[in-house]
A protein has these predicted regions:
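Sec-dependent signal peptide recognition
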Residues: 2-10
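Mature catalytic core of soluble alpha/beta enzymes
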Residues: 4-5, 18-325
Length: 325
């Protein structure tokens, strides 16, 4: 009798999985294009799931936005050099993890990059390279070491007047993680949160196949050189081949090294695979700044983290434990 019952349950589950379909919705959130994909029984159920994700992403945006004057992040920035600001534990922990990533990357990732003076222009209007003195001065207020966290009082304090923090290099990844967690908690068995290229997946397609991500060379975006399965993890690519400037024959990308104030050079694309999109997001930017050799060396020291790097000559580099098909 028990065997018969188990067989019936197994058949029911199998039929239910086969009856599910993939549903997608694309919209603009956090100033970027998001595509939310869920596996659901029908469009009505899918719409409920997608709305859950949208509301969660909007909640995160309100918490971390530096454009919203009423956000806790804006209050932190407004009180830089003045006094500590009480924040929600969620924001406190995000800032704390960001500081830890800064330490891990020797400052190549730094949420206080928002303090940087905007002296570089990548729209084609810049004809003369800024002076070394101006570049050095542009990062005087940048430095994660000047972010003070008090966990007992749940406060954040920026030591320097005029100092700011921003989550541009980690925020979308974090939002994707939180949306994914919420959907899983509400019974969504599989899906993808694509936050403008920051992809976070879980489960499998209704046909039992794994989700796959295509890796392209930005020098030839129509040419896919690798297709990799991603069942329960995140993939983030940093870099934009079109946004760069050239001085004295050297190409500089739009991603600025927060330690020096100089634009990064040598890499045009860095793709990072990690269990969470938050970490993949931050590390992709960090690898871009650190360069091929240092970036690969750092990634190879981290468990469950892999990366693919393309340099400005089109050469492809990969971390030790990733296989490219």
């Amino acid at each position: 009798m028990k065997k018969y019952y188990l067989i019936l349950v197994a058949v029911f589950i199998s039929l239910n999985v086969l009856s599910q379909s993939i549903f997608k919705r694309t919209l603009k959130l956090m100033g970027s294009h998001f595509e939310i994909t869920v596996v659901a029984n029908d469009s009505a159920q899918a719409q409920q799931f997608v709305n859950l994700a949208i509301n969660e992403i909007k909640r995160i945006e309100k918490l971390i936005s530096s454009w919203d004057k009423n956000s806790q992040t804006s209050h932190i920035n407004a009180n830089a050099g003045v006094l500590p600001v009480v924040v929600d534990s969620e924001l406190l922990e995000l800032i704390n993890r960001s500081i830890n990533i800064s330490k891990l990357t020797d400052g190549a990732f730094d949420i206080s990059y928002a303090s940087m003076d905007k002296i570089w222009k990548f729209d084609g209007s810049m004809k003369i390279m800024p002076s070394g003195q101006l570049i050095k001065a542009s990062v005087e207020k940048v430095g994660y070491q000047n972010i003070v966290i008090n966990k007992n009082e749940s406060t954040v304090f920026l030591k320097l007047p005029g100092m700011k923090i921003g989550f541009g290099a980690i925020g979308k990844g974090y939002a994707a993680d939180k949306a994914k967690e919420l959907l899983i908690a509400n019974g969504v068995t599989a899906g993808i949160i694509n936050a403008s290229g920051d992809m976070n997946t879980w489960g499998k397609q209704p046909n039992g196949k794994e989700w796959k991500v295509a890796i392209t060379n930005p020098m030839n975006k129509n040419n896919v050189f690798a297709t990799l399965p991603v069942t329960d993890g995140a993939v983030v690519t940093s870099g934009n081949y079109e946004k760069y400037i050239t001085f004295n024959g050297k190409r500089y990308t739009h991603i600025i090294d927060p330690r020096t104030g100089y634009p990064s050079s040598g890499i045009i694309s860095a793709t990072v695979f990690a269990p969470k999109a938050e970490l993949a997001d931050a590390l992709a930017t960090s690898v871009f700044v650190m360069g091929v050799e240092v970036g690969l060396n750092r990634i190879n020291q981290l468990p469950k983290i892999e990366c693919i790097i393309i340099d400005d000559e089109g050469n492809i580099f990969k971390s030790d434990n990733i296989k490219i098909n």
